[in-house]
UniProtKB/Swiss-Prot annotation:
Pfam families: Fig1 (PF12351). This is Cell fusion protein dni1. One of its GO terms (cellular component) is mating projection tip. Residues 1-32 form the signal peptide. It comes from Schizosaccharomyces pombe (strain 972 / ATCC 24843) (Fission yeast). Cell membrane protein which plays a relevant role in coordinating membrane organization and cell wall remodeling during mating. Residues 33-96, 154-178 are extracellular. One of its GO terms (biological process) is plasma membrane fusion involved in cytogamy. Induction: Expression is induced during mating. The lineage of its organism: Eukaryota, Fungi, Dikarya, Ascomycota, Taphrinomycotina. The chain crosses the membrane at residues 97-117, 133-153, 179-199. It is a multi-pass membrane protein. The gene is dni1.
Amino acid sequence: MLFLHSVVQGTGTLCTLAAWILLALVMTGCQSSTTSKFQLFSLATNVAQINVGYFNMCVLSANATLICKPQFTGCPGLTSISLTDVRSKFLINEVHPWMIVFSFCVCGVSFLMGVVSSLPLIGRLEFLRNIRISLSFFSFFSILVTALFAHVAVSSFVMAVGNGTQNRVTASLGKKAMIFLWCSMGLVTLTGITDSIILLVTSRTKKIRKTILEKSKVLTPSSSFSSKSSTTKY
């Protein structure tokens, strides 16, 4: 029973860690050449391509030169689109970058609570389990809202750019970032389910032990009385 409890709790903690890493990759998308493919959306022409993340942009020119910066005042081949305007108006008003930061922080706190609750002595405290379950479901809802806002807003923006530029600019959705967001939500959901199972099994086990202990206390006086009566007969 103890081994199964440890396996289930460890699985939940690892799921939270994986969700935390996925959120970090999405949040730091387009910060460098390593994370340049984790973009929310990309705009491309025959001359250049821009990948837009939550807090940065990466421009890939025709000669395969990659430049990543928080803002660009202009880009060869994309002169008809103000990239600063894309960042300031679209990202702030539609995607709400603070939501991914909030989800990342809540998921990180949930992971730390999972590590703390896995300790032998501290893990027995029931209120820590309740706090971790609450954090897991809170992380689920925050990531769900973040993913919905990002997916719907980016998809609408991509369609608007494709229809408004008369095929001069090709817009595409950042599939990896969206997949990471939805996968992190699924992992946090799995963590909440495992924590709920642990809490349910633990509470049921405590109730069974309590009833057994109460029955043993009730049976003890009667057994002692019967032993005394048997000795007086002899």
